[in-house]
Structure formats: structure tokens, C-alpha cells
């Protein structure tokens, strides 16, 4: 009854925040075995407090475009929970950004950061600003205007933002530069920085590498591996590119990539250098890949199956949804399973619908939910914070080894928790309960 009461209250209070509802529903319904066995969580109103952000900050961002016209966007930062450490979570610049999207991402971040073993609370922020087709100067002016409003709410031991969709190293650089001018301090207030001013080696690789490490841990328990296996990866940003890179390093065969306009299937396996050239150097579109590789076929989004994504209709052993939320529907899940998919590891946040997740759990495949499988990114952000605090950078090998260890520990925690609650293949339950218990314990200990 406790979970049902919370969900009803949420629906009544925020009726139009469908992404936030989806994230909360997925998480707290899997907490039922824990909540039924321990009534102290209800006594201390932990769920009520957990789903309500500690602070929501919204602000106007005014900036000048290249035609000297004033443009106005909306910026926000949702500081969700600081029970186990300073707020930590990315900034997203995309037209889809609204309160519901940022709250879902912030809520997910709380549980994800809890799993990392590092002392980080959860937050998320961003703007409805679209960096696509903007000039370098327009992006710089927007970032400076955004930081003019955000700077008073963040700090190295208060709230440490990072990048997300639409916010890469370039944007982080502009944001950091403006923060430094405003406060006259050089401190680790942002992660994802360039290597010459406090960034960490292995940061851009971290989410993708970590996702593959987690998938390998899941498969190892079943006496299997990714070596020699065909893999489908969606997206073509940092997460997708470095998922593909790590898959190639371990001998797997990634055959797909995508962007908002369509997807490519390369029967010979993805040419990583070409993909990096198109997406990182040129900032081009994925269709350019098919123009340069005769082995590749391009499918535009208008030709995708109704209610589905063409990328998940390519037969594969393992799928790595690494683009955006709700990119993998129940139709896609059915298709993946019927084509023999044995492993799904989520590089993106909430890429699978709740109905798709149910199918994966029923099929008992190796399914790594995003808050566990993609926690490598924020883990290395935490390691960047540690390097900034000590003013001592670490080598790529040291950071990668620490990342690999953290992903192993996350898997171990998730797997042991699932076994504790008599559902050993349910890593959704394992991840949510393991993440929740740590945060809840800290919340109860610190009082109301």
C-alpha cells in the first residue's frame, strides 16, 4: 500500500510530468520486497522525501545571436538529494528539456550515484537551448549567460555539474571559464573539463567503457562473453562511440550507430575512425558514414517501423541503447528477443520503456539497467573531483583501472542484492534496492 499511496500522490501532484512518473514508477515498484519487510522507511517518510527534490532552480537566460538579436531560453537546476554527498549530475542543452525530463534525470542520478561507491548526491540541469546549427560564438555567449545565473548555486562541495546531451568539452570549457571570472577562484566546480585545466583522462570514454565492463560482468556469471559477438549500439555521441571502441578492443563486432535523423548498419562492423571523423571532427550527420562506406546501409527515421526503432531490428547478441530516453519500445524488445538477443546494457538514461523492461525480465536475459550499467560516467566524474581536490592528475591507465574496479563493485552489489531478495536475474530490483538503501540510511540518520 505504501508504494501505491506514493504513486497516487505523485500523479495528483504532478499530473503532466510523464517522464518523471515513469522513472519513479520503475524504481519504487521494485522496492516493494524491501519496503514490505522493513516498515521503518514508511515511518520516516523516506519515499515522500526521496521523490521531492530538495531544491528546484529555474531562471531566464538572455543572450545575443550573431545577428545581434536578443534570444531568451529557460535554464534550470534540480538539486535532488544531498544525503550522501554534494549534488552531482549533468547539464543537458536540448529543445526537449523541461521540468519533467530534468526531474526524471535527477531522480535517476540519486540512485545511480549511490551505486558508484563514491560520496555524491544527485542533481540534473540544463536548458531548452539547441546547440545544433549555432555558431561557435553563439554557443559561447549562451554558455556565459547560462553560468551568469547558475554560478551562485554551485560549488566544489555544494553542487558539481557535468555534461550531458548537447554539453560536451567545448561547452564545459565556456561554462568553467565564466564561473572562474565570476567567483575569482580556480576550483573543481565542473567535471568533463579539458585536460589542460583540470579534466581527467578517461572521462569521455568512461560511460561507454563502463557499460561494456558491466555487460561483461553479467555475461561472465553465465559463462559467456562479448568476444566474437555481433552487437547493436544506438547513438553516435560520446557514450556510443566509446561503447563501440571498447567492444572492438575486446573482440566484439558492433554493427550499428545512429543520430536523430537515422541509423546505419555496417555488415562488416563499424569503422571507428570514420565514425569519429564524422561525429567528433566534422560534427556531421550519421548518413555521411553510409556515403563513404559501401558496406553500410542508412535508414532515415521516417522509414523506421511504426512504434519502433530500426536499430533494434538488426539481429544481435547484445544491445547497447546509448542515445536517449524511451528509444527502445515494447515492439523493439519483442524483436530483439525473437532475434536471439541475450544481453541489453543501457548506456543512456531510461532508454527502455517500462513495458520493454518487463519483457527483458520475463525472458531472464542479462539486462543491465542504466543506473547501474552507465554509472561509469559519473564514477569518473567523481574521480575527476578527487584529482582536482588533490591537484594531482592520474594516468589514463590508473583511471581506467579504477573505473573497471568500480563497475565490478557495482555489479557485485547489484547481483548480491538481487540474490538476497530471491530474484537473482533481476538487476532492476538489485540496482534500485542497493542504491535506495544507502541513500535512505543516510536520510534517516540525518533527521528531517
Curated annotation (Swiss-Prot):
Catalytic activity entry: L-glutamate + NADP(+) + H2O = 2-oxoglutarate + NH4(+) + NADPH + H(+)
A Pfam family per the record: ELFV_dehydrog
Active site residues according to the UniProt entry: 124
GO BP annotations listed: glutamate biosynthetic process
Entries under InterPro entries matching the protein: Aminoacid_DH-like_N_sf, Glu/Leu/Phe/Val/Trp_DH, Glu/Leu/Phe/Val/Trp_DH_C, Glu/Leu/Phe/Val/Trp_DH_dimer, Glu/Leu/Phe/Val_DH_AS, Glu_DH, Glu_Leu_Phe_Val_DH, NAD(P)-bd_dom_sf
PROSITE patterns in the cross-refs: GLFV_DEHYDROGENASE (PS00074)
EC numbers on record: 1.4.1.4
Residues reported in the UniProt entry to bind substrate: 88, 109, 112, 163, 381
Assigned keywords, A-Z: NADP, Oxidoreductase
Site (Important for catalysis): 164
Entry GO MF terms: glutamate dehydrogenase (NADP+) activity
Binding site for NADP(+): 207, 238
GO cellular component: cytoplasm; cytosol
Domain of life: Bacteria
CDD domains assigned: NAD_bind_2_Glu_DH
Subunit structure, interactors included: Homohexamer.
Biological role: Catalyzes the reversible oxidative deamination of glutamate to alpha-ketoglutarate and ammonia.
Family: Belongs to the Glu/Leu/Phe/Val dehydrogenases family.
Protein's recorded name: NADP-specific glutamate dehydrogenase
Amino acid at each position: 500500500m505504501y508504494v501505491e499511496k506514493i504513486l497516487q500522490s505523485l500523479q495528483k501532484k504532478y499530473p503532466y510530468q510523464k517522464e518523471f512518473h515513469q522513472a519513479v514508477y520503475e524504481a519504487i515498484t521494485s522496492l516493494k520486497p524491501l519496503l514490505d519487510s522493513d516498515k521503518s522507511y514508511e515511518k520516516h517518510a523516506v519515499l515522500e522525501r526521496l521523490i521531492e527534490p530538495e531544491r528546484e532552480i529555474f531562471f531566464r537566460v538572455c543572450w545575443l545571436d550573431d545577428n545581434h538579436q536578443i534570444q531568451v531560453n529557460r535554464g534550470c537546476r534540480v538539486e535532488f538529494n544531498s544525503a550522501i554527498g554534494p549534488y552531482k549530475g549533468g547539464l543537458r542543452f536540448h529543445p526537449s528539456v523541461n521540468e519533467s525530463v530534468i526531474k526524471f534525470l535527477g531522480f535517476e542520478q540519486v540512485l545511480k550515484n549511490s551505486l558508484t561507491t563514491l560520496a555524491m548526491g544527485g542533481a540534473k540541469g540544463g536548458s531548452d537551448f539547441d546547440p545544433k546549427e549555432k555558431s561557435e560564438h553563439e554557443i559561447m555567449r549562451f554558455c556565459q549567460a547560462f553560468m551568469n545565473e547558475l554560478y551562485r548555486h554551485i560549488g566544489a562541495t555544494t553542487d558539481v555539474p557535468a555534461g550531458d546531451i548537447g554539453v560536451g568539452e567545448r561547452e564545459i570549457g565556456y561554462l568553467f571559464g565564466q564561473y572562474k571570472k565570476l567567483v575569482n577562484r580556480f576550483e573543481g566546480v565542473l567535471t568533463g573539463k579539458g585536460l589542460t585545466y583540470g579534466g581527467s583522462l578517461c572521462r569521455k570514454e568512461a560511460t561507454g567503457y563502463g557499460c561494456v565492463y558491466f555487460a561483461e560482468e553479467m555475461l561472465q556469471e553465465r559463462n559467456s562473453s562479448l568476444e566474437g559477438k555481433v552487437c547493436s549500439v544506438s547513438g553516435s555521441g560520446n557514450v556510443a562511440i566509446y561503447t563501440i571502441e571498447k567492444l572492438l578492443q575486446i573482440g566484439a563486432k558492433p554493427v550499428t550507430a545512429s543520430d536523430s535523423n537515422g541509423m546505419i548498419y555496417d555488415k562488416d562492423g563499424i569503422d571507428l575512425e570514420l565514425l569519429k571523423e564524422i561525429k567528433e571532427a566534422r560534427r556531421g550527420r550519421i548518413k555521411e558514414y553510409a556515403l563513404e562506406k559501401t558496406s553500410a546501409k542508412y535508414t532515415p527515421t521516417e522509414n523506421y517501423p511504426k512504434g519502433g526503432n530500426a536499430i533494434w531490428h538488426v539481429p544481435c547478441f547484445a544491445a547497447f541503447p546509448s542515445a536517449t530516453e524511451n528509444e527502445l519500445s515494447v515492439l523493439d524488445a519483442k524483436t530483439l528477443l525473437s532475434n536471439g538477443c541475450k544481453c541489453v546494457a543501457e548506456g543512456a538514461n531510461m532508454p527502455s520503456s517500462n513495458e520493454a523492461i518487463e519483457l527483458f525480465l520475463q525472458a531472464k536475459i542479462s539486462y543491465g539497467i542504466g543506473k547501474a550499467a552507465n554509472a561509469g560516467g559519473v564514477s569518473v566524474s567523481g574521480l575527476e573531483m578527487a584529482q582536482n581536490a588533490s591537484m594531482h592528475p592520474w594516468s589514463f591507465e590508473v583511471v581506467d583501472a579504477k573505473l573497471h574496479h568500480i563497475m565490478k563493485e557495482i555489479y557485485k552489489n547489484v547481483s548480491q542484492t538481487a540474490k538476497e531478495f530471491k530474484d537473482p536475474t533481476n538487476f532492476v530490483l538489485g540496482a534500485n534496492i542497493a542504491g535506495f538503501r544507502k541513500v535512505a540510511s543516510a536520510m534517516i540518520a540525518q533527521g528531517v
